[in-house]
């Protein structure tokens, strides 16, 4: 696999490559600030997506999203929940621009970080090389990359693996790198699809401390979660049901 460096979200789900709103393929310019409540950093409206399954006489349509919509405001942590197959990951991919919707609009204000459910990393690159590669794609200079990388190694507790190739990493350490790539540019909006799969308890706790810090800094986080214990960390919960995003 050849690394692709450049603007935009990159291949579908590649470890957190988001970008600012000018880079996200499905993003439109964010709403203009006016008097009243703060503008949302993310607004999705009327998102529909249907997959085609089977071949020949068995070919059929499988509607997944049926006019789904949601929004996030600055300084919010929102949980996205729902049964398996309810469309959570599909919606996340559409929000970040890694998957085209059949209809609907997505408005994003600011830089986006994306952590896909399954880490898609380059087996022959080290953690340091991943962070350097993605930092260039984010438009960061070397000093900014090094400073951010050091903080992420410390906050997620995987600095001893920085010079190790991904092929030699455990699943939990790959998950840490996957999350670090999304956090690298200090995005205004962080989209996380079950980001802590494979984390031990200590790292799981570190994750929520880090997330609380982002809320305090006015950043927004959308987290796909299956854990009941996560609910205490969310400001709001949105449930995917019947192809729509419904406030719980």
Feature locations, PLM:
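The feature captures the beta-strand-to-loop junction immediately N-terminal to the Walker
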Residues: 81-83
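Catalytic Walker B motif of ABC-type/P-loop ATPase nucleotide-binding domains
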Residues: 190-194
């Amino acid at each position: 696999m050849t690394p692709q460096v450049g603007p935009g979200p990159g291949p579908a789900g590649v470890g957190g490559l988001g970008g600012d709103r000018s880079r996200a393929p499905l993003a439109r310019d964010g709403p203009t600030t006016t008097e009243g409540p703060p503008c949302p950093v993310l607004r999705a409206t009327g998102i529909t997506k249907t997959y085609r399954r089977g071949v020949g006489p068995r070919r059929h349509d499988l509607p997944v999203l049926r006019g789904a919509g949601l929004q996030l405001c600055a300084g919010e942590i929102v949980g996205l929940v729902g049964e398996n197959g309810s469309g959570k990951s599909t919606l996340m991919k559409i929000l970040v621009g890694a998957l085209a919707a059949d209809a609907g609009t997505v408005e994003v204000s600011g830089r986006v970080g994306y952590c896909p459910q399954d880490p898609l990393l380059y087996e022959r690159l080290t953690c340091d090389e991943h962070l350097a590669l993605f930092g260039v794609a984010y438009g960061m200079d070397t000093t900014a990359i090094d400073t951010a990388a050091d903080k992420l190694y410390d906050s997620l507790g995987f600095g001893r693996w920085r010079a190790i190739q991904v092929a030699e990493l455990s699943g939990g350490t790959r998950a840490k790198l996957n999350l670090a790539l999304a956090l690298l540019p200090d995005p205004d909006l962080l989209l996380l699809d079950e980001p802590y799969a494979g984390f031990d308890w200590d790292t799981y706790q570190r994750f929520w401390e880090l997330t609380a810090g982002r809320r305090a800094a006015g950043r927004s986080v959308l987290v796909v979660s299956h854990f009941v214990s996560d609910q205490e960390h969310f400001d709001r919960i949105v449930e995917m049901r019947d192809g729509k995003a419904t406030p719980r």
